[in-house]
Amino acid sequence: SMCPLVKSSYGFAISDRCPFFHFADLVIGETTCDGKKKMYELMSEFKPVHVMELPNSQSERGLVFWKSEIIRTKEYLEEFFHIVITEEMIRDAVHLNNEIRMSLKNLCELMKLDPAPVKGEDIQKMVQGSKYRFDFATTPGVVKEVIDKIMTEYRQGKHLEKRPRILVTGCPIGGDSLKVIRAIEDNGGVVVAIENCSGVRTLGNPVEEDCEDIYEAIARKYLSTGCSIMTPNDNRIDLI
């Protein structure tokens, strides 16, 4: 018995029904849960897979190890694609992704308004959809336009009626599992925050762009994520 995330991911991959997997040259995985580790092992039978070994504690020793894994992955990509990834390229990517995360965080924080400006499903679709854009550089501007439009309409009185405000936490939500949000909102509630891997959990704590060691900065940002595989997992409690 495996969780729906593992079953659906592997099912879409092996059945060749996922266009993203179909056109991908390489899959990068990570050692989070046992189910995903076994999934990547089986995926490697029909697609190149590189697995990053993720520490299970947010200690300084874990940070050193995670930094080495990031560098190892960078070197693997260079060898696999026959390219050179410079530090300047890394810093440019860090800056862009910081801007993207900040714009999406600002979007999610609109749900602090009471009554809520829009449904939580709409926000989640926007956050999820941002991951599948071909031109990432335009994402912050597009998200800002959406924020401005929502706020303009809110000031005009266009918003939801007062509803019970719901926090959703737990496993990632996307695709068919959006029905969880839909069920809540079709029955009179409004999902104002989604605290999971596909929600606000990844949007805080930007990578420190001015850090002399950019790889350590990247490692520190991602290792601090309040993921359920971490023990202890105080960062998740703090986020909630």
Provide a role label for each language-model segment:
Residues 75-206:
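A charged, amphipathic alpha-helical module
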